[in-house]
Structures are given as C-alpha cells and as structure tokens.
Regions:
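Short beta-strand scaffold positions
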Residues: 18, 139-140, 161
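A short, histidine- and acid-enriched strand-loop-helix "catalytic/donor-clamping" loop
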Residues: 85-89, 107-122, 136
Length: 172
C-alpha cells in the first residue's frame, strides 16, 4: 500500500518525529511504500531525508490547503496517517489541521498521541472533527480508547488499540 505519514519527522528531535520514523521503517519491512509530510516550525529549518515529499510550516495556514491539494493529486498515495498531538499543528490548539482534513479526499487513519480527559472546548472540537472523518482511530491505551468513544464521540468500531511500544535496539 502507498502511505503518506503526516507529522513531525527527524532530524527534528521529538517523540512523535521518532515515532513517525519507526512507524515508517516498520511499514517498509512489510512491503508498503511510505512517504512523509513533515510539519516544521518554519520551512527549510531542517534538511529532511528524501522520503519527505512535502513540508508544512506549522503556523503558515496556506500550507495546510497546499498540503491537502498535494495529497489529493498524488496518484501514489492511497492512505494518509495523521499523527495528532495538539502542539504539532498551527493555530489555536492546532486547529489548522482541520483545514487540511476538510479538503482531504483520501482516507486517513488518525493516531492519537494525547487524548485529554478534561479538554477545553477547542481541543474537544478539534479531536471530534478529526475522529469523525477518519477511516480509523488509533489509541495507545485502553483509557484513551474509552475517551475517544465516550467523550470525543468517535465510532467505537473505528477505534483500535495499538500500544506505543519501542523500536528494536541492541542491548550492550
């Protein structure tokens, strides 16, 4: 399957960037083609590897519309994986990601890294919006699965538990 992962990505140093790289490596092992759309604090801040095919300046709202157009016109993208954490995307509480999703014509899987038990109205609305349009929602804990269903109104049949895990490494 041809997949595009949307989130932060190395050389940015953050947990989701590392998660995105590890997920890509795992998907490649299983025969998938995986491209990356990286979200940065500003364009051209990082020298990304060749798998990064598009860069979003997180606070530049037009980039989200351009990103959706890029995905929609990419014949070699069948599925989008969106790594969601409120601090990744621009606007109040990361609201700009809704612009991209609102234009997206391809199916996407929403991976929830933070599911707040007592969200602000804005945070709740954003996650409701994203989950309500997703083909699947990935939660990393049973508690976040319940919150996604009960509080964020994601359809229970679309929520999957995939524990975070760790990458393989040699113990010395």
């Amino acid at each position: 399957m041809a997949v595009l992962n949307l989130g932060t990505y190395p050389p940015k140093q953050c947990g989701i960037a590392t998660f995105s790289m590890d997920l890509r490596n795992s998907l490649l092992i299983h025969g998938n083609e995986v491209k990356v759309m990286a979200v940065s604090e500003e364009k051209n801040k990082y020298e990304y590897p060749p798998e990064v095919v598009f860069e979003i300046d997180r606070q530049h709202r037009p980039d989200y519309f351009a990103a959706a157009s890029f995905i929609n016109s990419a014949a070699d993208v069948e599925l989008v994986i969106i790594q969601h954490e409120y601090g990744i995307f621009g606007g109040m509480d990361g609201e700009y990601i809704m612009d991209l999703v609102g234009m997206l014509l391809k199916p996407y899987v929403l991976v929830t890294h933070t599911v707040l038990p007592n969200p602000t109205r804005s945070c709740k609305n954003i996650l409701n919006y994203l989950a309500g349009r997703a083909s699947a929602v990935v939660s990393m804990t049973r508690n976040s699965m319940m919150l996604m269903s009960d509080l964020y109104e994601a359809p229970p049949e679309l929520i999957y538990l995939i524990a975070h895990g760790v990458p393989e490494f040699k113990v010395q």
